[in-house]
Regions:
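Single-stranded nucleic acid-binding surfaces, predominantly the OB-fold ssDNA-binding core
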Residues: 1-196
Length: 196
């Protein structure tokens, strides 16, 4: 299970890559943040021919959350999290909702934020199949807060199966480069609201 529904403004439409004769595009979707927080910037990938939208359009889409790991010459990995979509319109609109299942492949410890809120991070290994039958392994970073974080810390361990429902969130962080320059990057995670 890997189902995402989103509503937002499409921005920064451009070329991503090509495989064979198929061109893939990329864009950002600006989604209204929950609870009055800043907007979330969700990365999108899609087959270029499937995009019928223009810069700044308000759109509603469904798709699935994927991860892509890129290895560099210095043996460092960069994992990119994005939503792949065919621009199908969801039958039931949720402005930002994701359903996922899989096995926990990395589990953090229960922590307390500087604001006194309990939280825990874990990585979910999620497998999906493309329409062509290709199996994709995705590794999705997840965060849980408050009482829910305590429950998951007590009940679950690495390799355990879990189903979750939540939102996709983004945050900007600074990356210090070898030449002492600073690069601003966007990281994505699933904030878990329900589980079973």
């Amino acid at each position: 299970m890997n189902e995402v529904t989103l509503q937002g403004y499409i921005r920064d439409i451009g070329f991503s890559h090509d495989i064979g004769n198929v061109e893939y595009g990329k864009a950002n979707l600006i989604c209204t943040g929950s609870n009055g927080k800043e907007d979330d910037i969700i990365s999108l990938r899609f087959k270029k021919f499937s995009n019928r939208y223009n810069e700044g359009d308000l759109i509603e889409i469904s798709g699935n959350l994927r991860s892509y790991s890129q290895k560099f010459e210095n043996n460092k990995n960069k994992v990119e999290i994005y939503v792949f979509t065919y621009f199908d319109i969801p039958s039931i609109l949720e402005k930002n909702k994701i359903l996922l299942d899989g096995n926990i492949c990395r589990m953090g410890k229960l922590n307390i934020s500087k604001y006194g809120k309990k939280y825990i991070h874990f990585t979910l290994a999620n497998n999906i199949f493309t329409p062509g039958g290709k199996k994709l392994n995705n590794y999705i970073p997840c965060t849980v807060y408050s009482e829910l974080a305590e429950e998951i810390a007590e009940k679950y361990n690495v390799k355990d199966y879990i189903q979750i429902c939540g939102d996709i969130h983004s945050h900007t962080y600074k990356k210090y480069m070898p030449d002492n320059s600073i690069e601003y990057r966007i990281a994505h995670e699933v904030v878990v609201k329900e589980y079973k």
